[in-house]
């Protein structure tokens, strides 16, 4: 007790007026004794007391589910006797398991807390006092970027962000002279549009950082991919060497990458050969400092099948019965047990409508509901607890590719942690939350195909004395296309599956654009449009455009809407959408955002009517888009990966 009082006074001397004593009441004997002692000290030294509750679950009824979760985490069975007398969470006693003392560790209401501390009413008042003192952590702030060093010549403004933009502008036009033989008015207009958008959003530093580590990687002999995702739609990125695909040649759109009407975080992901990836990460850590670079945490949650199996193990259901019960859940990623049990079977928002369950899967869902309703069936309790635990965090991991680079020590900006499988700090926030906090996330990906290409080129040089620059090979090589036409694509990146080989033999691709289209079409959803694409290429099916104005944009894909970029361009051409509007439409169609689409439809029809297009035709175009545009693919990404595939062949 004397030691406790000395510690009490030590903290009081440090914090003074901001020192409070926390009281919790969970009906635990040891806690009752400690509270009495703390109240004595508080009275003796005139220290304020506050009331809190140690909440580990929301509702009191979830206490058992929480106990099961503890058993899952510790590998115990719930039938194992509980160890309630402990002074240390890490204490282990043979034949007993860790458990909470009772069911009082839930989120209590204001009235419950007031009643619980009715003998110490000031504890509630002082709790509110602390709330008033707390400064809210607002994650919404200006983009957080390291100060990228630039030559003194470009430090012409008081604002570092503007100076970085001046340097980026210089590098872009210098790079454009090398990329393009002649910079015509169209090139200049596109470059200026992109630079203006980058300047407005304050992202120049981001481009410089990515350019720098890609350049460093190449200098170290690391193989870097030609680009990935929507960033390949940027001419600025192409001119400064971030990407290696000319966006203007393939009609790739910058606004697919950065929407000029809506500030959103840029996202440039980069592929490296397997060995080179770590060397580039090491370069970044050395340049910016270990305290400013972190990997991203991932949270593994309990999915439908997992929650059933985990709960069944804890509740000692035989494995055979556990497996049989979990088999009633369809083998589909993202399927929800709560939806299977509680969603309507038919009609709007039903299992038939949203999940599109087969008759057998629908019958299994009904079986699960029957089991839950049968209170005498032990499996009913398992389902009941599995429903509560579905979505709970089961484990943490480290994102395979994600990295953040901060302008200062990360401990001053976001919560961080350490992980046994990472040499770097790990964020406690996941990627989406990190980005909403204006911390830049970048993906450093290892691509085995680049390692294969690198090895092949080294062997050619070693055995034949020929050095090949794989990034400048001609894209009209007849022999290469013959491989594709015969379906001889074993080991060829993205084109090696038997289904793809079958379609390649039918398509007989003879131009690079065919490979881009096939890369975009060969995936669930648009797969059914491949036969139409093939027939139209070979003239076995006529190409019909709803409006003549659509031909310019859809001609390359024989009238089939393959790419998101085509929808974006058509909306601008037919309905005078801005570049920003077009990107908003693309995103809404891909994510099936009905409320946004309803507004955009009215705008589209009105814009078309202004341009004297028949409303009926425009309605049909919109309906076609709604049916297919959710499957339309990112042309920038497809072009980059078709290029890697061509290099592989």
Per-region residue spans from a language model:
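Alpha-helical scaffold/interaction cores of sigma-54-like transcription cofactors
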Residues: 1-649
